[in-house]
């Protein structure tokens, strides 16, 4: 049984907690996270105060993609946070740019996730 299918589990709170953990692990600033999600920093803070982020919302879908990128990086680098952060902030010739900068646009975020999935062999 999925954790989200259990009674009493709030999917909005679970997504927000996973997103904030992802931000911390990847060493993203609040401004960088807000840029990826397409919201301003104040809106991001309000979501934290409200206790959740709807998975079905546009922001929620972008958050799920970012979490997917984190999980792919974790698998590729064996959980080495320094290497994961280096990947995001370094020029990548296959992606023709810096992944973190590309992730500020939806198509860039999708491209980075697809690239990570491809090199993992998924």
PLM regions with names:
Residues 1-122:
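Non-transmembrane "mature" sequence context
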């Amino acid at each position: 049984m999925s954790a989200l299918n259990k009674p009493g589990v709030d999917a909005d709170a679970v997504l927000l907690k996973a997103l904030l953990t992802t931000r911390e692990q990847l060493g993203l600033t609040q401004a960088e996270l807000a840029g990826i999600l397409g919201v301003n920093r104040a809106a991001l803070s309000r979501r934290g105060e409200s206790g959740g982020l709807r998975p079905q919302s546009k922001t929620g879908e972008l958050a799920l993609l970012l979490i997917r990128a984190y999980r792919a990086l974790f698998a590729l680098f064996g959980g080495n946070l320094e290497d994961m952060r280096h990947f995001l902030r370094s020029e990548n010739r296959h992606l023709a740019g810096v992944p973190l900068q590309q992730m500020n646009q939806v198509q860039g975020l999708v491209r980075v996730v697809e690239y990570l999935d491809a090199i993992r062999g998924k």
